[in-house]
Amino acid sequence: MTVTNTYNPTLFFTRVVFQRITKFTAKANEENEILFYALFVADLCLDMKGGLIAINKPSGRTSAQCLNELKKIISNSELAQYFRPAPPHPNDRNRRRRKSNRLPDIKIGHGGTLDPLASGVLVVGLGTGTKQLSSLLSCMKTYRATALFGCSTDTYDSAGKIIKIAVHIPTKEEILSGLDAFRGDISQLPPLYSALHIQGKRLYEYAREGIPLPESIKARSMHCEELILKDFIPKEEHTYTDPDEFASKEAIESEELLRPIEGGAERHDLLAKTEQDINPQDGDEKINAKSPTTNSVTDVAKDQTVTNPKKRKFEVTDLARGSRPAIGPIAVLDMTVSSGFYVRSLIHDLGRQVNSEAHMVDLVRLKQGSFALDDENCFDFSEFSAPGWEEKLAAAFKIDLKGDETS
């Protein structure tokens, strides 16, 4: 995060003065031309600076909400001038379409979305640092996830509604054994409630509107470098509870259509090749695949090398009664995974792997690339609403707010 631009006190003072004038003074376009020429020249000498920082995103907020709030805070600070791009040249035709007395917004972006439920490392690029964010797309990430066994939900986490109650509660030994199927290179089916696109529309939009998917969801190749059971807590010793609401039959059927077969390693072998269909008497049509990597059950049946998948039993007896499910144990998992990995899917699939049901109740991103949650330079999001954050951020980018860059 070293800043290499040479600071010129005179030009810096000129730039700040003209910024204040253009912000608070409404003048004719002809008079503002002089101000824009001066501001343009000053910005050429005081180039935009920037870099990458890590913030600890709080649970309950989206990554976009955090970024918008951070943008507003920094834009109203002294540091904003360092993260704004140079204004357009006065002869630029597009400039005349903009408000003549408005400064450019600061440049800000993040290097990978975290679910609203999740907390932890969110890498933020400021100024020129936004150009470095693409380097984070392929880096490994480390998470600590908490799985609650006993039921599965439509969103695969605690924010969703129950779709199935477990008839078997796994032991610690069963979970340890079940983790073996998810290490190394695996195929992973993304959750229906995700931001992936199918034909220009996000998956969660189809789910919320109750619209059938126009094509099947493709299984994706992922890599799990490390997966360990950090802790196992029996149901009598933790305070987590299952969701209170049960999903509708339509939502359950949508989930049934996504999952090829129930449980076991057989599911992972067929994941990239099969699509499950509900029994014909249930009145649901099959989802036909349009990709070479995900075929319908009919296509798989033609392949003599693949065993015909079992039809999944569709049970809603407990859901129809509206009874509260039994609470199972929790398993705390530490994992280092490739980019694009869905931790929710791993937990959901782990539940099926041990002949049970599970959903995610907590997720913390511990590390992304070289940025770690326990680094002293990682900002807690609450710091930006307390005094002293400007000095800490300036120090991170080696900027002296008094006028000179630090070495």
Curated annotation (Swiss-Prot):
One GO biological-process annotation of the entry reads: mRNA pseudouridine synthesis
Q: Where is this region: Disordered?
A: 83-105, 274-298
Q: Where is the signal peptide?
A: none
E.C. no: 5.4.99.25
Q: Which residues carry the post-translational modification Phosphoserine, per the record?
A: S291, S296
Query: Which top EC class is named for this enzyme in its record?
Result: isomerase
- Coiled-coil positions are none
| The entry's keywords | Isomerase, Mitochondrion, Nucleus, Phosphoprotein, tRNA processing
Catalyses which reaction(s): uridine(55) in tRNA = pseudouridine(55) in tRNA; a uridine in mRNA = a pseudouridine in mRNA
Isomerase found in the keyword field: yes
Main location per the UniProt record:
nucleus
Q: Name a single GO cellular component.
A: mitochondrion
**Where, per the database record, does this protein carry Phosphothreonine?**
T293, T406
Matching entries from InterPro entries are given as: PsdUridine_synth_cat_dom_sf (IPR020103), PsdUridine_synth_N (IPR002501), tRNA_psdUridine_synth_TruB (IPR014780)
The answer on whether this UniProt entry bears the keyword Mitochondrion reads: yes
Q: Give the matching Pfam families.
A: TruB_N
Give the UniProt subcellular location, in the record's own words: Nucleus; Mitochondrion
One GO molecular-function annotation for this sequence? RNA binding
Family membership: Belongs to the pseudouridine synthase TruB family.
Say what the protein does. Answer: Responsible for synthesis of pseudouridine from uracil-55 in the psi GC loop of transfer RNAs. Also catalyzes pseudouridylation of mRNAs with the consensus sequence 5'-GGUUCRA-3'.
Name it.
tRNA pseudouridine synthase 4
* Organism (species): Schizosaccharomyces pombe (strain 972 / ATCC 24843)
